[in-house]
Amino acid sequence: MAENIIEIKNVYKEFNGVPILKDINLNIKKNEFLTLLGPSGCGKTTTLRILGGFEDATNGEVIFEGKKINDVPPYKRQINTVFQKYALFPHMSIFENIAFGLNIKKVPKDQIKTRVKRMLKLVDLEGYENRSIDSLSGGQQQRIAIARALVNEPKVLLLDEPLGALDLKLRKEMQIELKKMQKQLGITFIYVTHDQDEALTMSDKIVVMDKGEIQQMGTPEDIYNEPKNAFVAKFIGASNIVDGIMIEDFLVDFAGRKFECVDKGFEPNEDIQVVVRPEDIKIVDKDKGMLEGVVESETFKGVHYEMIVKENDREWLVHSTLKSEVGTVVGMNIFPEDIHIMKKVSD
């Protein structure tokens, strides 16, 4: 198992007496692609800035390779940062932009040339050394910003919503490129985003944050398929969340009937919440379904139809490849492996 390169221990941060981070604890492994995911104001960027040395924690420790670095300035940390605003120098060539940090460190010129060429190859911009920044597209400028950060050979790269300014097509392409770069280089990437698709596409581990606290951490599959609470379930993709009762291990009561499930470990007859993803509800003939409802709306989304099906006083969001006309009475089946049980937390 890979060892930790960074440990965040009980990090608390407040601004003007208002808590922004509430005793965050997080271990980040070597060569891991970790994403801090959450809505605006959740504390993800503050966490990143504390790691980079741009903000001080009010309390707590940041450990890098076994040593506390709270008082180490940014330029002495083996950590580099790429921001959404690329901060490239328009009066310099691409070569000069990438080489800027190496020149400051007085690295020998032959080494600078070798390292810059290696970075240009990595970001698929070989032969661009003498071009101006203004001649590049947004996606190419972002690649240069990444190359400039990586040429210093950091052990950790911090990325603060670096793809936010790109259009959808470029963003999708850069997601694949970033993951490829990270694997080739074998260094740790810590990525901040509010975009669930980005997090699910690129990450080895996702840390979901809200209101200065970690709500859940795990693999993309764990986060999507086994959300820990209603916030995570709603934030990571669309969800149907309903109240229910866990009758016993592998048996749950919701929507007026009993369903087999794969969860266990709850108290008998414990109040719980059930999560069912829209794509996990199967539309069938009304006399063949576990539940029955009326199609209230239907929208074609390209790869599926998105429907609202009203069952008694409850509305279900359903994604199906089968078209059902509005007003049609349909059956709905939900299989045990598609029912996810969460502890019920009072508001």
UniProtKB/Swiss-Prot annotation:
Lineage: Bacteria, Bacillati, Bacillota, Clostridia, Eubacteriales
NCBIfam families membership: MMSYN1_0197, potA
InterPro entries assigned to the protein according to its UniProt record, in alphabetical order: AAA+_ATPase, ABC_SmlMolc_Importer, ABC_transporter-like_ATP-bd, ABC_transporter-like_CS, Mo/tungstate-bd_C_term_dom, P-loop_NTPase, PotA-like, PotA_ATP-bd
Swiss-Prot/TrEMBL keywords: ATP-binding, Cell membrane, Membrane, Nucleotide-binding, Translocase, Transport
Keyword flag Translocase: yes
E.C. no: 7.6.2.11
Major localisation: membrane
GO molecular function, a single term: ATP hydrolysis activity
Family: Belongs to the ABC transporter superfamily. Spermidine/putrescine importer (TC 3.A.1.11.1) family.
Function statement: Part of the ABC transporter complex PotABCD involved in spermidine/putrescine import. Responsible for energy coupling to the transport system.
ABC transporter domain boundaries: 6-236
Gene Ontology cellular component list: ATP-binding cassette (ABC) transporter complex
Record PANTHER family: SPERMIDINE/PUTRESCINE IMPORT ATP-BINDING PROTEIN POTA, SPERMIDINE_PUTRESCINE IMPORT ATP-BINDING PROTEIN POTA
Subunit structure: The complex is composed of two ATP-binding proteins (PotA), two transmembrane proteins (PotB and PotC) and a solute-binding protein (PotD).
EC top class named in words: translocase
Binding of ATP, residues: G38, P39, S40, G41, C42, G43, K44, T45
Subcellular location: Cell membrane
SMART domains: AAA
Disulfide bonds: none
Name of the protein: Spermidine/putrescine import ATP-binding protein PotA
Reactions mediated catalytically: ATP + H2O + polyamine-[polyamine-binding protein]Side 1 = ADP + phosphate + polyamineSide 2 + [polyamine-binding protein]Side 1
Keyword Amino-acid biosynthesis: no
Membrane topology of this protein: Peripheral membrane protein
PROSITE patterns xref list: ABC_TRANSPORTER_1, ABC_TRANSPORTER_2, POTA
Highest rank taxon of the organism: Bacteria
